[in-house]
């Protein structure tokens, strides 16, 4: 059985822990408990082969900026998460999380995950958010951000579990097929004659 280490990063309260609990227990936590550091494990089959997916949940709060990178060595894949209802968490993908991950573990595959995807189809929630002048991060913006950081973009909902399995299957695929999923930009060359 191949072991794969997946570290999950992103701002506090974007839904990282809920996503991990939803995936590993098929349940949704009833209350918010900030994470300092937690581990989960999922054994699964993909394409007829067994994998042990070690899921490392990290704290997004600034207080843990010096502690969090201690979980980065030997990481096979990172999930950088943001909430589709938080522009600030979306902006921090590049201004904080990608910089941090790329500094400590350059070249490790990244999957960008937009959490709380269920809200896209919930007109009541969208209306309440608009009343508070909160706009959803458009799906296309997620795709653009993923391209910018050379990542794959997926959206998921811990509440409905929509897209959750895809996220973690993609974690494994990005490790076992690293060159098939992320197209690196071709280097431009100049020939002088």
Swiss-Prot record:
UniProt keyword annotation of Nucleotide-binding present: yes
Extent of motif Effector region: 32-40
UniProt main location, coarse: membrane
Binding site for GTP: 10-17, 57-61, 115-118
InterPro entries: P-loop_NTPase, Small_GTP-bd, Small_GTPase, Small_GTPase_Rho
One Pfam family hit: Ras
Subcellular location as annotated: Membrane
Coiled-coil residues: none
GO biological process, one term: response to imidacloprid
Alphabetic keyword roster: GTP-binding, Lipoprotein, Membrane, Methylation, Nucleotide-binding, Prenylation
SUPFAM superfamilies: P-loop containing nucleoside triphosphate hydrolases
Propeptide: 191-193
Residues carrying lipid (S-geranylgeranyl cysteine): 190
GO molecular function list: GTP binding; GTPase activity; protein kinase binding
Topology in the lipid bilayer: Lipid-anchor
Modified residues (Cysteine methyl ester): 190
Assembly and binders: Interacts with pakB.
Family label: Belongs to the small GTPase superfamily. Rho family.
Function: Might act in concert and/or share functions with other members of the RHO family in the regulation of a subset of cytoskeletal rearrangements that are required for these processes.
Xref: PANTHER family: RHO FAMILY GTPASE
Protein name according to UniProt: Rho-related protein racF1
Organism: Dictyostelium discoideum
Classification of source organism: Eukaryota, Amoebozoa, Evosea, Eumycetozoa, Dictyostelia
């Amino acid at each position: 059985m191949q072991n794969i280490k997946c570290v999950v990063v992103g701002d506090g309260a974007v839904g990282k822990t809920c996503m991990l609990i939803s995936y590993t227990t098929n349940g949704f936590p009833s209350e918010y408990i900030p994470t300092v550091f937690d581990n989960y494990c999922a054994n699964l089959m993909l394409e007829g082969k067994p994998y042990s997916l070690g899921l490392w949940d990290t704290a997004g709060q600034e207080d843990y900026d010096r502690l969090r990178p201690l979980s980065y060595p030997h990481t096979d894949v990172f999930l950088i998460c943001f909430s589709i209802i938080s522009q600030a968490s979306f902006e921090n993908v590049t201004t904080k999380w990608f910089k941090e991950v790329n500094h400590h573990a350059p070249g490790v595959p990244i999957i960008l995950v937009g959490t709380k995807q269920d809200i896209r189809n919930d007109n009541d929630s969208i209306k309440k958010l608009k009343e508070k002048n909160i706009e959803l991060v458009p799906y296309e913006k997620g795709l653009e951000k993923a391209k910018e950081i050379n990542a794959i973009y997926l959206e998921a909902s811990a509440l409905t579990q929509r897209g959750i399995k895809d996220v973690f299957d993609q974690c494994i695929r990005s490790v076992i097929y690293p060159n098939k999923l992320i197209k690196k930009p071709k280097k431009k060359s100049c020939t002088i004659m």
